[in-house]
From Swiss-Prot:
Pathway: Metabolic intermediate biosynthesis; (R)-mevalonate biosynthesis; (R)-mevalonate from acetyl-CoA: step 2/3. The keyword Isomerase does not apply. Belongs to the thiolase-like superfamily. Archaeal HMG-CoA synthase family. Its EC number is 2.3.3.10. The active site is at residues 82, 114, 236. CoA binds at residue 241. Keywords: Acyltransferase, Isoprene biosynthesis, Transferase. (3S)-3-hydroxy-3-methylglutaryl-CoA binds at residues 30, 114, 155, 203, 236, 245, 268, 298. It catalyses: acetoacetyl-CoA + acetyl-CoA + H2O = (3S)-3-hydroxy-3-methylglutaryl-CoA + CoA + H(+). Interacts with acetoacetyl-CoA thiolase that catalyzes the precedent step in the pathway and with a DUF35 protein. The acetoacetyl-CoA thiolase/HMG-CoA synthase complex channels the intermediate via a fused CoA-binding site, which allows for efficient coupling of the endergonic thiolase reaction with the exergonic HMGCS reaction. It comes from Pyrobaculum islandicum (strain DSM 4184 / JCM 9189 / GEO3). This is Hydroxymethylglutaryl-CoA synthase.
Length: 350
């Protein structure tokens, strides 16, 4: 693999938060039991004028600002989301104009549950590596859905992350990648349905754990990595328990996982989930650090990446772009009625 990697990153988390205990009280659940079950204290909620498009735009603008490159040098843009405002109309084309990209650009909305943004990353890497484009961008953004009263409601949240890929000015060089995919019916949403469904027992062992472990072990066996090689490990975060447990199953010390865990404070941002943890690590990483990144998407599949941080990251970290940690602290709490209003879940019938 020729030299290619992350040139810049940008993240966006809506300011609004609803506490898990607030949701639990509405549905008669024991708040302490729910918090302990999912290890999610609160989740981010998009504002009434926000959606996956505005979230993607904000994250992408921050990535461009940090990179200090002309937007017209971006030759491809990919958007991964489960929260498209339009059934037929791409978000990626909206971003082309909103970001001031050239019209001579590859633009595609990706689909693979929570790892669609990760697939966009590999697509961008391939085009950059081939020499067809100078820079590529992938965005993972969601305003994820959870049916009222159903357990997904405790974690489904909103946020976005954008990554710029290139050869020049690399902050995290891509060393290796490995993919593990199978037909596993753990989670789905049919056409026209407002909320997803999940296969209960399929969401754990057969889906999340099997695929993340399959991708990570496959990568380690193919390229000769050991758990001790990684400074940080970031996994998909559907709740606070799963990433910690999968790290233990892979013999990766919890100290390497905790710095990238954000789900406790903002819930599961779906396509931005693992990427948000990755962005948080990039905000603090030092040259020479090695990062294991393993997104997961229901249906099901996982990609395992290894990045090595370069000296260039020190310059990128000095910009005034908000860090993930700053956004985690910048919040406004809302109650359940405001939550329903902001998520447009109150329907009026004639």
């Amino acid at each position: 693999m020729s030299r290619v990697g992350i040139v810049s990153w940008g993240a966006y988390i809506p300011k609004y938060r609803i506490r898990t205990e607030e949701v639990a009280k509405i549905w008669g659940d024991d708040p302490l039991r729910i918090v302990d079950l999912y290890l999610v204290d609160e989740k981010s909620v998009e504002g009434i004028d926000e959606d996956a498009v505005t979230i993607a735009v904000e994250a992408a603008k921050r990535a461009l600002k940090r990179a200090r490159i002309d937007p017209k040098r971006i030759g491809a843009i990919y958007v991964g989301t489960e929260s498209k405002p339009y059934a037929v109309k791409p978000i990626s084309s909206i971003l082309v104009d909103a970001l001031g990209l050239s019209n001579n650009v590859f633009a595609v909305d990706m689909e693979f549950a929570c790892k669609a943004g990760s697939e966009g990353l590999m697509a961008a890497v391939g085009l950059v590596e081939s020499g067809r484009i100078e820079y590529g961008m992938t965005v993972g953004a969601d305003t994820s859905q959870g049916e009222p009263g159903e357990h997904l409601e405790y974690s489904a949240s909103s946020g976005g992350v954008a990554l710029i890929v290139g050869r020049d000015g690399i902050v995290a060089e891509l060393e290796a990648v490995y993919s593990f995919v199978s037909d596993t019916p753990d989670f789905w949403r049919r056409e026209g349905s407002p909320y997803p469904m999940h296969g209960e027992g399929f969401t754990g062992e057969p889906a999340y754990f099997r695929h993340i472990i399959g991708a990570t072990r496959g990568l380690m066996e193919k390229y000769g990595y050991k758990p001790s090689d990684f400074t940080y490990a970031v996994f998909h975060q559907p709740n606070g328990r799963f990433p910690v447990r999968v790290a233990s199953m892979l013999n990766i010390p919890i100290e390497k996982v905790k710095p990238g865990i954000v789900v406790t404070h903002i819930g599961n941002t779906y396509n931005a989930s693992a990427l948000m943890g990755f962005a948080k690590i990039l905000d603090m990483a030092k040259p020479g650090d090695k990062i294991l990144l393993v997104p997961f998407g229901s249906g099901a599949g996982s990609n395992a990446y290894v990045f090595t941080v370069t000296d260039t990251i020190l310059e990128r970290q000095k910009t005034d772009v908000p860090t993930v940690e700053q956004m985690l602290r910048d919040k406004i709490y809302i109650d359940y009625a405001q939550y329903l209003k902001m998520r447009k879940m109150i329907k009026l019938f004639e």
